[in-house]
């Protein structure tokens, strides 16, 4: 008999509601066409990529953005998942080379990419060439710095995978906090802001970011576990990590994740109430930024069930009943995402 899994409703009491950017449909059309133009995947994988609708994720994550900044968000989410799909099947050395290509492309957008280079370089160059036009100087710097950190952690993830290295909970979260790509995503929240370093680096703001990132990590790992175990790629997932360290099963790991998530929620809300005031217009920007962090947690969860990334067409049903069936192993020779057959869930 197939094993059933209960997905904890980690956001049952989260105060940020579902909020979709009104420019979603129009901007999605442009960004999806842009992403598809690179032909990064074969036909079937491209269809699966389209069904994932990473533009929906951006439109939940940046509900107040104007069309230009939403386009940057959509393009970034598409770029993230191009990098993700290629790095997931690459060696540490190959991922290191991919990182070098991407960072060179972002730091030198005026430089044409070499013929025959990995496609991620040109995707990155075009993304940043457009996105930086809508970003403040501080936000540009923070994006580049945090994107470099993100890519370095993806290299580390590849090293762990190649060496079959299974981390403990704390060690895993140290790496996962960067591989999830939250920090560069947060930089987009401040594209139209002028937040000084002393504000963005304030301990309370950092604590808010850290709690938000950990909730994103846990939430994403809960919904992605089934697909990742089916692809035999669940070594970099908190459910697997908790099962190994706590010597428990999937159900036990899910309970642990739910309890830890509640602690993170409390920590976030405590710090949300402690955000200091600097005076003047900066306080309005800080309030928007912190609200954006809270919204990101809801955005990631909502997209996980409304797109077809993890549950095929059954997401809206599963978000209500929470029970799913452990999927059978999936083997694909084709690079890129795979279409999820909801009949297995």
Swiss-Prot record:
The free-text note explaining how the cofactor binds reads: Binds 3 Mg(2+) ions per subunit.
Listed as disulfide-bonded, the cysteine pairs are none
Q: Which cofactor does it need?
A: Mg(2+)
Pfam families linked: Terpene_syn_C_2 (PF19086)
Please name the GO terms of the biological process aspect recorded for this protein, alphabetically.
Answer: terpenoid biosynthetic process
* Record key words, sorted: Lyase, Magnesium, Metal-binding, Virulence
Q: Which residues form a coiled coil?
A: none
Q: Which SUPFAM superfamilies match?
A: Terpenoid synthases
> Which amino acids does the record list as binding (2E,6E)-farnesyl diphosphate?
309-310
Print the miscellaneous field: Armillaria species are both devastating forest pathogens and some of the largest and oldest terrestrial organisms on Earth. They forage for hosts and achieve immense colony sizes via rhizomorphs, root-like multicellular structures of clonal dispersal. One genetic Armillaria gallica individual localized in Michigan's Upper Peninsula stands out as exceptionally large, covering hundreds of tree root systems over approximately 75 hectares of the forest floor. Based on observed growth rates of the fungus, the minimum age of this large individual can be estimated as 2500 years.
Provide the protein name. Answer: Delta(6)-protoilludene synthase
